[in-house]
Amino acid sequence: FGQSAGGRSVKTLSASPLARGLFSKAIIMSASGLATASPSSSMSAYMSAFAPLTLEESEQQTKEVMDWAGLTDLDKMRAASTEFIFSLGSIYQSVTGKRTWMTTGAVSPMVDGYVLHESFDDAALNNNLANVPYMIGFTLNDMGNMAPGIADFCLNREQAGDKAYAYQFARPLPTDGRENVLKGAFHSSDLWYVFKSFKNSWRPWTEGDWDLSEVMLTAWTNFARFGDPNGQQGGQWAPYTSENPRFMIFRLDDNDAVNSEMGEPLRP
């Protein structure tokens, strides 16, 4: 269960043979789906920045950056400050125009042949992902349109015999009229609802927000317990399949996205 970079961690664990049998369900929040299956998707370029590298590729990129910075041996590297090493990738890119794994930080997994034999996308396309139920989704005003990649992933899981439940969070967060605040259903906004942590925020939450949070918290809990967001009694949220290509839309009413002036949500 993870969101954003945490969602990418879930994807990595799902692709790692060393993690087999260590988890029985997986929730991927705001980490897109498949990138290679939809190369024209607006998220493909973004997700490619986090594409796994081989161990040899990552070592070569690291050496290039260190040599450029004059850190040509271990003594010099160890003498450099943590802050300098941490920022070195960004400095290198701004000066040279070259992007490395050090630019994106430690969120790009390494295909080392041990923990990872292949990328998440390749593992999915080669039917080497963990065969567990999946819940996967994003927010209306996320970092990009993740719907195509998520749909492709769900169809891929259908072919593998796994269930995959897709969702979109489309409730624009309420504001008190102040400027310079995040608006809409932005990246990470759904976490307030999943954890029902409204009391830790200044936003003027409504009774409807509390009700929506209860619905989402129940769905996440049911999925964690039963592998089905509906629970043992069943419900309206069916897996995304070729015959049922539908996302569950979490919002208060049909006017949510229109009123927010942030764009139209997906249709359930």
Predicted regions and their residues:
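Substrate-access "cap/lid" subdomains that shape
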Residues: 11-15, 20, 25, 29-156
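Acidic helix-start/capping segments at beta-turn-to-alpha-helix junctions
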Residues: 2, 82, 242-245
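Surface-exposed, flexible loop/turn segments at secondary-structure boundaries
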Residues: 6, 34, 85, 142-143, ...
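A structural signal for well-ordered alpha-helical segments within the folded catalytic domains
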Residues: 8, 56-60, 147-151, 189, ...
